[in-house]
Amino acid sequence: MVHVETQKIRNKEQSPRVAELRQELRRKIAAHAPNAGAHATAILGLTLYRRTAPSPCYPAMFEPSLNVFVQGPKRIALAGTTYLCDESTFVLSSIDVPIVSQVVAASEDVPLLSLLLKLDMAVVREILSQEEFHAYDGSSPVRGIAIGKTTVDLLKPCCRLLDLPS
């Protein structure tokens, strides 16, 4: 039997500025994505998502990307661990990763809203080559994705991306 561990990224009290930026990002995504579905933008690799109904679990492939959730819960399963993502989380994938995904709750009135920015790995490698890193010590599992809490430093550039002309 496979052990399944569920993790929820704890939504500790976040600053009023994080809440304000999240609300601004919600408004911008809702304006650019007025209907359910995936909405390409003028920015190569930037897609906005609006889901208006829960979904069954479905297999998907996470490409190298940054996915920022701003409204609604989504469940992501990877390698025996299930993560519950919500408006306080982001998912960063550095490699192609097979996952199982599910929109947990969404409606016309309160849709799941998120943005996904595909990463150009050649650019990432170039940036990383300019930094000094310590060798991986093996202290944590390597899964190909990282899930964390959104911050002002992440939400501000996301808001600026959606200010660019379409």
Give the positions of each predicted feature.
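A short, N-terminal "cap"/entry segment at the start of jelly-roll beta-barrel domains
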Residues: M1-A42, T47, S55-P56
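Amphipathic alpha-helical segments enriched in hydrophobic/aromatic residues interleaved with Lys/Arg
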Residues: V4-A19, E126-S166
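Short flexible/disordered coil segments
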Residues: L21, A105-V110, R160-L162
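N-terminal regulatory/effector-sensing and dimerization cores
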Residues: H39-Y136
